[in-house]
């Protein structure tokens, strides 16, 4: 395995983050968003269900701090060296008397940030209130600064390398919708159609494999069409039913979404009027 992009691309991203940190007068930044860790270093593992962060400094490569059993994925998917991999012990997981963020805080202390301004992501999944509280109480000697979405803004404008990966994701998304079109029919169960969709999304296209998309396949059929994000069921599609499918493709963690509406037979005039209006733009 190797990182999804070459080192120069990751260096470009790190330079952007450090520039934004300087603009906000930050000496360091603690990242809790798995997507931001992935964008910055390539780190890719299903490890975000336990406490983990990435520390960004001005004079040191990014530092990953997480569960010991997940440290191997850092070497497999990033350019980081052993000096930048700081795991905590397995016996700290799911304990009431101690929290992994305390060990992470002790490790961060080694970078001599006392009295320094340290940013953190305040509104992100998988970086819980307790995790933030334990980290900040452990490192009470630093000045904490809300730096939410700092990395996200750096991600906004895509590089040429990123656009190429997104094009592959879009091709996968287009193929996924084509597969859905070929298999959707009255009598087919929603779950069986989704099985075809997931197979197509994972197999990818033209030799490029697919990843798990950020959004699972959404099937809006029958009563479920009255809401925005219903999960699929084992209910068969019906004749003359209007069905909306919100699908997508993913490649190297880059996503492309594509929504389509199908009419399984005859539909009310309002459906055709809406389709004509959409076609006209």
Predicted regions span which residues?
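Active-site neighborhoods and metal-handling regions in enzymes and metal-associated proteins
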Residues: 1-281
């Amino acid at each position: 395995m190797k990182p999804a992009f070459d080192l120069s691309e990751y260096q470009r991203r790190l330079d952007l983050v450090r520039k934004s940190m300087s603009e906000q007068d930050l000496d360091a930044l603690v990242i809790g968003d798995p997507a931001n860790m992935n964008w910055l270093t390539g780190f890719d593992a299903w490890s975000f269900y336990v406490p983990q962060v990435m520390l960004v400094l001005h004079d040191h490569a990014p530092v990953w701090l997480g569960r010991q059993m997940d440290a191997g994925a850092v070497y497999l998917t990033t350019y980081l060296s052993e000096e930048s991999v700081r795991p905590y012990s397995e016996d700290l997981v799911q304990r009431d008397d101690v929290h992994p963020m305390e060990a992470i805080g002790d490790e961060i202390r080694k970078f001599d940030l006392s009295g320094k301004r340290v940013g953190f992501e305040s509104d992100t999944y998988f970086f819980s209130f307790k995790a933030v509280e334990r980290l900040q109480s452990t490192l009470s000697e630093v000045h904490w600064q809300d730096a939410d979405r700092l990395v996200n803004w750096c991600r906004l404008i895509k590089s040429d390398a990123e656009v190429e990966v997104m094009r592959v994701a879009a091709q996968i998304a287009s193929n996924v919708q084509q597969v859905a079109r070929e298999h959707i029919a009255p009598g087919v169960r929603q779950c069986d159609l989704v099985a075809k969709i997931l197979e197509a999304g994972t197999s990818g296209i033209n030799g490029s494999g697919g990843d798990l998309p950020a959004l699972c396949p959404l099937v809006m059929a029958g009563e479920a069409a009255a809401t925005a994000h219903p999960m699929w069921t084992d209910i068969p599609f019906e004749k003359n039913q209007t069905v909306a499918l919100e699908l997508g493709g993913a490649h190297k963690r880059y996503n492309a979404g594509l929504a389509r509406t199908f009419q399984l037979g005859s539909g009310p005039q309002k459906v055709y009027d809406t389709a004509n209006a959409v076609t006209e733009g």
